[in-house]
Curated annotation (Swiss-Prot):
This is Negative cofactor 2 complex subunit beta. Residues 11-75 form the Histone-fold domain. InterPro entries: CBFA_NFYB_domain, Histone-fold, Ncb2. GO terms for molecular function: protein heterodimerization activity; RNA polymerase II general transcription initiation factor activity; TBP-class protein binding. It is found in: Cytoplasm; Nucleus. PANTHER family: PROTEIN DR1. The gene is ncb2. It comes from Schizosaccharomyces pombe (strain 972 / ATCC 24843). Belongs to the NC2 beta/DR1 family.
């Protein structure tokens, strides 16, 4: 599992860990930076251990992606059974969030306007742009100016097909 990072580069955000610990500890207790760093080191090792076990399970099943079931089985194999219930709960919440997530629609689908109407509007805009361009050419110089032809939407569509 070498993705360009050395093991000593793997870590957790120190400020986030500090805040989590501070929220849990009673107000009269303090948490030193050294203790925080040791906790982070232990957490990273735990994550590495579980993910390595889950990866082995995944490979034995000839799967390419580690799924929640692989993590649950890894927790069982490593005898971290006390984490399984919460892991299942989080996995179920995640699955529900994914189901409820609104699928992003394209601008075309959201517009409520048919393809033909959009093409008509585009043609109209191009026509107006051509008129403005012609008028600018006439107004700015009445001597030798060559207008550049702008293809219509139907001409462009015909060339693409």
């Amino acid at each position: 599992m070498n993705d360009g990072f050395a093991d000593d580069e793997l870590s957790l955000p120190k400020a986030t860990v500090q805040k989590m610990v501070s929220d849990i500890l009673p107000v009269d207790l303090t948490f030193t930076k050294e203790a925080r760093d040791l906790l982070i080191e232990c957490c990273v090792e735990f994550i590495h251990l579980v993910s390595s076990e889950a990866n082995e399970i995944c490979e034995k099943e000839a799967k390419k992606t580690i799924a929640a079931e692989h993590i649950i089985k890894a927790l069982e194999n490593l005898e971290f059974k006390e984490y399984i219930a919460e892991a299942l709960e989080v996995a179920a919440e995640h699955k529900e969030q994914q189901k409820n997530r609104e699928k992003k629609s394209s601008k075309f689908e959201q517009s409520g306007v048919s393809r033909d109407e959009l093409l008509r509007q585009q043609e109209e805009l191009l026509s107006r742009a051509r008129e403005r361009f012609k008028n600018q050419n006439i107004a700015h110089d009445n001597h030798t100016t060559t207008a550049i032809p702008v293809p219509t939407a139907s001409e462009t569509e015909t060339k693409e097909n």
